[in-house]
Regions:
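Well-ordered, non-membrane alpha-helical segments in soluble/globular domains
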Residues: 48-63, 174-195
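N-terminal interaction modules that seed assembly of large macromolecular complexes
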Residues: 68-107
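Low-complexity, serine/threonine/proline-enriched polar segments
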Residues: 103-181
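Amphipathic alpha-helical elements of HEAT/ARM-like alpha-solenoid repeat scaffolds that form extended
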Residues: 265, 269, 283-296, 320-334, ...
Length: 373
């Protein structure tokens, strides 16, 4: 099971638990620390402030592009980010796309389907922007100092607390910007550019603006749909309408099964999706494991006893992957009771002796669920 796909999809859908009460301090010496309070005399840079600065920086790139002869038949704009927290702006025009594919040594062998796929492949876009000028350039560099420190420390809890003088502090960032926050930033900046900057561009009738996560399965199943209305989405990607219909038919068919069999059905879909086999449901319909989690969670409270029974069984068998999937279903579900939390605590007792990973999984999940009650 791909927990990263699940986490990123959940973030893009706005189902994200932000770290709102901690801050990262970046000193003039580029050292990075954690703190629970903003050092005196400083203001923390949060999501809104960072998004505004990034939007303004990309606006300048768009304005510069708009003044060139290339500003015609612009059909796509995308704000890209990934686990490395880089932010890139991509633009493409029909002419730029034509130059890209005709310049390829494989041009003569491209099918129409391949050409269409390349049309929205960011790596084949003719115009991209990854550098910044002015005050945001130093803020962005310090932001990446924090990213590197978090990676080296294994997360916020691995950073040392800041005990130095406020005079040594260069920037203070809210922790919500990191650990997945970059994906929400990319989406919000895309929406801002769509509202504030696209008027500068000479766009095509089917112009599309979208964020990108670096995973086509996440992008097509979740991300693009946040900024492209359904009618336009199907017009640009007609194959996705067939994928959506096929997946929805599978959802409706599964709903007719007994609850225990529904749990088994979606778990088997996740297992089949491990290696992206072309005939696997999630792969064939351009979905991720998140949609399997969501399909079960959407059934609601009636399916929870079957989920808990399957969880106890997977814990007893030491099947960490299946247990993790079922925990994700619980995290996606609403209306959980304290009784379910009690059952999770009891389920840990079924774990094989010495299997601390499953015990830790259940503890982390239970803590997250408890925080929602």
């Amino acid at each position: 099971m791909n927990r990263q796909d699940i986490a990123v999809s959940r973030i893009f859908k706005g189902k994200w638990e932000r770290d709102e009460h901690r801050f990262l301090v970046v000193t003039h010496a580029r050292d990075v620390y954690m703190t629970n309070a903003v050092p005196k005399g400083h203001q923390a840079i949060g999501r809104q402030g960072f998004e505004t600065a990034l939007t303004d920086a990309f606006y300048e790139h768009i304005r510069s592009f708009a003044r060139t002869a290339h500003n015609r038949n612009v059909y796509a704009l995308s704000v890209y980010t990934d686990e490395r927290h880089s932010f890139l702006l991509y633009l493409n025009t029909l002419e730029g796309f034509e130059r890209t594919i005709t310049g390829s040594p494989y041009y003569c062998s491209y099918s129409e389907e391949q050409k269409h796929d390349l049309k929205y492949s960011l790596g084949d876009f003719a115009f991209s922007y990854a550098t910044f000028q002015g005050p945001f350039a130093s803020q962005y560099a310090a932001y990446h100092d924090a990213v590197k420190a978090l990676s080296a420390a294994g997360g916020p809890d691995g950073l040392e607390p800041y005990k130095g003088s406020p005079d040594l502090v260069r920037y203070v960032y809210k922790a919500e910007l990191f650990e997945g926050g970059q994906f929400l930033t990319a989406l919000h900046v895309t929406k801002r550019l769509l509202a504030q900057s696209v008027w500068l561009l000479q766009t095509t009738p089917d112009f599309a603006a979208f964020a990108s996560s670096g995973s086509e399965y996440i992008d097509y199943s979740v991300v693009m749909r946040q900024t492209i209305d359904t009618e336009r989405f199907y017009r640009i990607f007609p194959e996705m309408k067939s994928c959506d219909e096929a997946f929805q038919a599978a959802v409706e068919e599964a709903r007719g099964l007994p609850y225990g069999e529904q749990v088994t059905y979606w778990w088997e879909c996740v297992r089949e999706n491990r290696n992206r086999q072309p005939d696997a449901l999630l792969t064939a319909t351009v979905r991720t494991d998140y949609q399997a989690v969501e399909a079960l969670a959407d059934v609601g409270a009636p399916i929870l006893p079957a989920v808990m029974q399957a969880l106890r069984s997977s814990v007893q068998q030491g099947d960490q992957e299946k247990a993790a999937f079922l925990c994700e279903v619980l995290l996606e579900s609403g209306g959980l009771s304290r009784e379910v939390l009690g059952e999770m605590a009891a389920a840990a007792e079924y774990a094989p002796p010495g299997d601390q990973e499953i015990r830790s999984l259940l503890t982390r999940t239970r803590q997250k669920l408890t925080g929602r009650l």
